């Protein structure tokens, strides 16, 4: 497993249906972009706190993390406390 550098994305096993829905949407978007890409560039950008590689992925010249953020299915992240994906109860 790897993590995209610089983003926080919702979890497929998230705490609420909204988070799980957004996670499925993000997963589908990533899959479609990778399968449809003519060129895929991956660069390791370090390791995260659990030891998984952090990577930057560029598909046909477009940064995948930025595309996820622009679609609202990921947030910028640089190690600070994560914001919840679930609405307040």
Model-predicted segments: where are they?
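Small beta-barrel nucleic-acid-binding modules, primarily SNase/OB-fold domains
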Residues: 1-89
């Amino acid at each position: 497993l790897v993590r995209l550098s610089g983003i926080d994305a919702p979890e497929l096993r998230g705490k609420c249906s909204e988070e799980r829905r957004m996670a499925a949407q993000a997963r589908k978007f990533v899959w479609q972009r990778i399968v449809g890409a003519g060129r895929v560039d991956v660069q390791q950008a370090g390791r995260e706190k659990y030891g998984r590689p952090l990577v930057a992925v560029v598909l046909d010249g477009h940064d995948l993390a930025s595309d996820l953020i622009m679609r609202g299915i990921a947030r910028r992240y640089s190690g600070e406390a994560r914001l919840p994906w679930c609405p307040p109860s």
